[in-house]
């Protein structure tokens, strides 16, 4: 069997378990000696990580449009310096990508969806995700998980209604689209790990 080099995205609101799953898949790839790169957004290289610190710093209070532009700046650096070099050459695991911008900045904050899509299209050009996991969590578990987080950033401080709007946005993006897989983070973690791993195996071995 030959190995495909897909771009795989893990999406979801804070506390939904996406980072736990991406770390699990990373460890699996390391054990199997499968070449991959793991990137987070905002982040992925020195320039994008610098912008990330600005966005998430609790001391900052940017308006929603400034936030949007900072996310795009970080993504531009990430694509130019990291993703382009690895696209189709290595499996790419992304902790957040373009759907996060639409879910948070459009569905959550009310910014223009057409503008967001236009800039994303300009940045991505021919880069396309092959598989997108969207982790969903109910309000009760969300509140519980956020309370347990040791390192809180500015986006951990929004109210539950905001996160519910964002999550509904994610589900709208995923509706009737084959690249998307909804992961119910209210289920046992071991079940979700198995589901994610099985889906990934199906696309990396063709």
Where are these regions (language model features)?
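ATP-dependent small-molecule kinase phosphotransfer cores
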Residues: 34-124
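Walker A (P-loop) phosphate-binding loop of P-loop NTPases
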Residues: 15
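NTP-dependent small-molecule kinase module
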Residues: 2-3, 26, 140-206
